[in-house]
């Protein structure tokens, strides 16, 4: 049984006694004042925008739901900052329009979850400004188009282990709390379901050391909605029922810091972008766990970029949860992190490691990826890595492909079987990743690369299961040295004589040379040396791509081939040697 929910509003994120005082407190800080000004500006722009329409993109309504969520969060926060009635009226108009949609697309339940969260916040935060007819209309939609469809049929996300679990339960709990006095039994059932099932995804997502299996971009998605759910529970009940104590969650900010390389680009494995925007989740986490060091230079600059923007139109969604950061923002003192290494832990769903030689923009960085291609948002990238030195990313990962574009062409993007179309997609399959290939074959999707030895300057991955049937043992050792050089040693045994091993990496730098490779970028140079094998081969990405692939301008796949000797064993050593390296 849950503690009783009172009939008083607001109760989402805040309580009826304290109300919106946290908004005023944040407004007294430098960063809070800047964000408040941006929110009010956007609210004024939204007064001129037409309400959302139910326009599908392929099988999704998600873009519309996200746009509505940004609009309602912005207008509701702006109303409580200014008491300007027009903001509340515009939010009510938006909510009434989407309440009249035929449905919120329950076949893709993320769409329902984000729409339900939007209306729940608006209904709760603007309750006193709505008339009885508006309240009934919005409340009915939350119940009939939001919460009840989550109990119709069997939804895999209820017990799932990825971001769908986090997002969908958060949306449903928001809706349940908003209408709790009208539907107390439905509300309690919905909230208890979330409390019971969220640990499944939290353990998979954060345990043991906070690394997110789907990469930093999806950390932003899954963690933001995990935080939404925990903040909702704390606002309504004064507790999160132990969810924030799940191992790894309290240190997950370390993962974000470690995943941001010296250039500001991410260690963008899996379906990931190049950079993170300012994060509502991070602001909550900093305050919840007293970690001002997570308000890093990158987060600080991202927030500044967001607050300086003054968009003239808001037809498409922006950083939709950022207005809620005003509940948690403080002027945290700038505290530099001094951790040069990060390890996900050997029990992590997707093992990763990150190393750096320092905290300057020119210091070296190495990100190492284990795991399985069949993992959440997985790529064929077991053993892959990214590498930076002297302010240049020399070895790249191309990150995510455009989902809608691929789906619209009829490709089976979400099928992780060995023969799936997914592995034909350049950014996702083996051709674009910095991995080993045996006889040109892809990695095995049922394989799983583990980090079997982690040290402060190096790690070893066991890649054997990715190449089962072609080798008895495959390991990769990566060492980032204090002088910024990177040494990679691949040991393969139990192979057929004369089998062809391809050693490849992805780069955006210019490349030349056959025996010793020279990479050049922005006036910087780096040599790549190997212990054996044939000449370096430099292949423009477009020669490896299909017509359905997104453009990858300037990207090269650099490789060499080596034949397996008669004894079936082979060791390959490759060194990346930046010019002007430290301690030369």
State the predicted function of each range.
Residues 179, 218-394, 453-462, 560-569:
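Carbohydrate-active enzyme catalytic cores, enriched for enzymes
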Residues 172, 256, 355, 490, ...:
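A residue-level signal for conserved active-site and pocket-lining positions in enzyme catalytic cores
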Residues 304-308, 405-584:
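CBM-like, beta-strand-rich accessory domains located in the C-terminal region of large
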Residues 11-18, 25-28, 32-265, 272-273, ...:
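Aromatic-lined, polymer-binding surfaces characteristic
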Residues 1-13, 20:
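N-terminal pre-domain segments of enzymes
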Residues 337-426, 518-530, 573-584:
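Beta-strand-rich N-terminal accessory domains
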